[in-house]
Amino acid sequence: SFLAKHGWLDLEQYEKKAEDQGSAEHRLLYPLRPLSVSAPSDHKNLLVVVVDSLRADMLNNINMPNLQRYADNHFNFRQHMSGGNDEAMGMFSLFYGLPGHYYGDIRADKRPPVLFDEMLRQDYQFGLFGALEDAKQYRQSLLAGLRKQVFVSRQTDDRRLIDDWQQWLGTRTADRPWFSLVYLSSPGDYQVPASIKGPFQPELTRFNPATAYRPENLQKLENRYKNAVFYTDQLLEQMLTQLQLQGLDDQTIVVVTSNHGQEFNETQSNSWGYGSNYSTYQVQVPLVLAWPGAEPAPQAQASSHLDLVPTLMKNMLGVRNPYRDYSTGRNLFEASTRTWLLAGDQNDFAIYQGNTITQFNKQGDFELLDRDTYRPIKHGTPDMGTLIQVMNELNRFYRAP
């Protein structure tokens, strides 16, 4: 391949060497050093709401008026990318602050995120809401360190899920900080209660994958999605109001984001939904952040799911280590000179830099694409300086073979 030919990249060969050294447990060095922590005397609560398949362009006054109003009064990261283009990579990058390249080894090692470990050490109550626990992938990664029963509700009906969350909020132990993850699935499932007629019409009344993607149904499919998003916006308003009513909004960090985007064939490549390419339609998502005591300011710089963990570890939990000890992200509140963002899984990677997307795989094959059109850039060559930085990030949490 082009990159291997330049003598410094063949991830496959590197991985094979590393595998010969033994199991994931001996390969993975995460975190790189033990954590040094100055825990705060006054703990903030943490609410993370992940809305399945929420496109970045849905955060506006028409599709999500409630969340837009909330975003206007808090931190709204408008150039925000997930760390992947599917559910597993989106959630992994958000809670580990690591590229998806490490996912297989984290799972093999059943290594929980340092964020969760540290919250447990600081006596946070965990309340998780959504249909996550059934997936083996989460039991071997995100949830691996959670011995106690922390799943309060596995409802797939979002309204009931919110009811369960509100009940939990009212009955938890008042003198301990809490962490709550709420996973809302309506947009990804095109789900709207039958009793609700959404404002976007005409819509597909029933989502059938066999017929939904026909050209004549495109507008109806998009409207169905927009109605599910609009419905979700009302549920978010209900949650945020509940925090206020219980007097918790000034003690609670709130994060609203998504696992990945949702494409409606904008790339003209018969791509629908997620997981099929690294266009911004599938990877760019909203990130709205409320942080008690912080003065909101417009957020113009590009940000990534990889940045949430460093921000929470330092500013919420008092971790003193450099971010590089446990993440490839940076603190959202600190100015950055970073010129690129990374998304990907265990095999494929995408670097977002200016108006270019550089995609490459473990074999070292690469392609340059226009960020807006997702069309190949002919005769383009990758930015070698950036690729070397990225390769370092993809390897530095492994022991050298």
Give a label for each model feature:
Residues S1-P209, G329:
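Active-site-proximal alpha/beta segments of enzymes that process anionic O-linked groups
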Residues G22-A24, L29-A39, D134-A135, T241-G247, ...:
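Membrane-interface soluble catalytic domains
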Residues L11, D163-G170, T205-T252:
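A long, amphipathic alpha-helix that forms part
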Residues I106-P113, Q219-Y231, N277-V283, A294-P310, ...:
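A short beta-strand-to-alpha-helix junction
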Residues T232, I253, N259, N347-D348:
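Soluble extramembrane regions of membrane proteins in the secretory/endomembrane system
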Residues Q244-G293:
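Histidine-centered active-site microenvironments of extracellular/periplasmic hydrolases
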Residues Y70, L94, M119, V182, ...:
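Structural scaffold positions in well-ordered secondary structure
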Residues A39-D42, M119-R121, R172-D175, L248-D249, ...:
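Extracellular/periplasmic catalytic domains that process cell-envelope and extracellular macromolecules
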